Each structure stands twice: as C-alpha cells, then as structure tokens.
Amino acid sequence: MTAKAPPAPHDPARAIDPILERIFSFPRRHFLSAGDLNAPQATDLLDLADAFVAFNRQTSKSLDILKGRTLMNLFFENSTRTQSSFEIAGKRLGADVVNMSPRTSSITKGETLIDTAVTLNAMRPDLLVVRHASSGAASLLSQKVSGSVINAGDGQHEHPTQAVLDALSIRRAFGRVSGLTVAICGDVLHSRVARSNVALLHTLGASVRLVGPPTLMPAQAERWGVTVHHDMKAGIAGADVVMMLRLQLERMQGAFVPSTREYFRFYGLDREKLARAAPKAKVMHPGPMNRGVEIDSDVADDPEISLIQDQVEMGVAARMAVLASLAHRLEEHGQ
C-alpha cells in the first residue's frame, strides 16, 4: 500500500490572496482618519491584518505586493515604533523604502511643508507616510501630491493606523470588538490616539469611556459619543479593556497636573485600580510608557493581562494591511 503523502504545510501567504481579492478600496485615495472607514471596510482591513500576523511569524517574510513601488517615510516628529513598523511593513511587501528626517531636510532651512510636498511629488513616490506636529498636516500634504498619503500622527488630531492595530489587538484577545467596553484613560486632551480609537471602536460596535482629570479632558468630549469620568476607579469599573495614554508633557504649556506623583496616585493604573475592571480585562498602552506615572510595571509586564507587546507586533501587520489596501487602490486607478 502506498503511503499517503503528508499534508502540505500551511502557507500563511496563501491566506492573504483571497482577502486581497475581496478587499475594499479605501473610500479615499489616502488614509487620513479612522473615521474614513465604515464597519465592513474596517472588518476587511482587520481580516487582512490578521492574515499578515500569521505571515510575519514565519521564517520567510517577503511578498511582492508593493514591488516597484516607493514608500517614503516623512517623520517631522520623533518616532520609534511607528516609523520602524512602517519601514518593516513596506519592505516585507516589496517596496523601496526611503526615510526622510527633518534634521537633514530643507525644512531646517525654512522651507514650508507645501514646498516640501511639491518637491517630493516631483520624485513620484507612490506612498507617503507622514507624521507632523501640526493638526491637518497630512491632509494638506494629500492635496499636493499624486501618491497616497497615510497619516502617521498629525498633532493632537488623529493617528488612524494606531487605532487599527489597537482594534486588531483587542479582536485577537477577545475574538470580537463589538459589545466590549473600552476605557481610554489619562491625557485625552493631547491624545491623537484617543481620537482615532474612539472613532474606530465606535464603528466596530464597542462602547467607549474616557477617563481623566478635568484639565486633561477635551471640552464637550461627550459629543464624541462617549461617557466621561473623572474618577478612575468608577471609570474603569467593569471595563473589558483599559487603555492607558501617555502623559504628553511636551504638548503642555501650563500646569495640567500638580505632579507626576499625584497623577499616578489618582490616574495611574495599578493592581488596586485594575481590580475594578472586568475579571478578564486586558490592559493596553500605545507607548512609549512612563512607568510609575501612567502605569505600574507590575501591570504593564504581566503577560496574562497586558496586550502592550502584542500592540507592537500588531503594528507591523496593521500597517502592512493599510499599505496593501492603498496599493490595491492605486492599481485600480492605473497608477
């Protein structure tokens, strides 16, 4: 009797193709806001990102989805996680990746962002990833270039790919996003992460709470469709996910908190406060963390409850999904 051949090993790359075949085109040529996505589009994007997670865990991590395309990273603010993950994402998809630093650009010589955009557009990059200290910078750039622009953070406005990776982390931990309660805690006022997460989590069916001191809460935040809490323990009571935010001292021009010690006492996440959340609650932080200010190390480093390292891994997969989807749209339009 002839022995049966062993089953072919699972190839994560093959799981990507059918998703790409049914993938939506982005509602716009650019990805500037988490609000650009409706629920089916967001779900498709998470499905694609999920396939890239499996792909990234194999030994060979090379695809040709962006072969012949040029990805340019324009980071006018410091970044470790976001810039590195976009660079890795682009290279794994086969793109030529160019990193531009403001320290070596003509911006230091007085060139405006618009002039920079016009100059870069003459080089015909296909995809431009932009981080800038000014709200609306990515939108402005998108009006001046022929390639697709991805907002990697514009001032206090938005950080849409962070919201995608956060939603992916939550979905992988719970198997769903819809019906969950997510408490976003801390410096909401200065947080582009909070704004993008509120938009995407609502789209995916989650209930969102904002928790923080009155001095760090946007005026009329309830208009975002959230509940606002100034008491940390009450705000995270029964929450499935507790998402901590970095205290952005560099964006503060006054005394928003008495001291970091006092801030941790009332709004830093420790075991005692976390006990108020749901029994199987998960903890998140977009990074970089200020340990002992926003979150206790004992909580941040506990693999049973913390998704913080998962968020870093999901960042590459989520950004691969965004880049691949935009490339799909470029092909549809013959670019």
Swiss-Prot record:
It catalyses: carbamoyl phosphate + L-aspartate = N-carbamoyl-L-aspartate + phosphate + H(+). It comes from the Bacteria. One of its GO terms (molecular function) is aspartate carbamoyltransferase activity. GO terms for cellular component: cytosol. Carbamoyl phosphate binds at residues 81-82, 131, 159, 162, 287-288. L-aspartate binds at residues 109, 192, 246. Pathway: Pyrimidine metabolism; UMP biosynthesis via de novo pathway; (S)-dihydroorotate from bicarbonate: step 2/3. One of its GO terms (biological process) is 'de novo' pyrimidine nucleobase biosynthetic process. Gene3D superfamilies: Aspartate/ornithine carbamoyltransferase. Keywords: Pyrimidine biosynthesis, Transferase. Its EC number is 2.1.3.2. Heterododecamer (2C3:3R2) of six catalytic PyrB chains organized as two trimers (C3), and six regulatory PyrI chains organized as three dimers (R2). Belongs to the aspartate/ornithine carbamoyltransferase superfamily. ATCase family. NCBIfam families: asp_carb_tr, PRK00856.1. Catalyzes the condensation of carbamoyl phosphate and aspartate to form carbamoyl aspartate and inorganic phosphate, the committed step in the de novo pyrimidine nucleotide biosynthesis pathway. This is Aspartate carbamoyltransferase catalytic subunit. It comes from Caulobacter sp. (strain K31). The gene is pyrB.
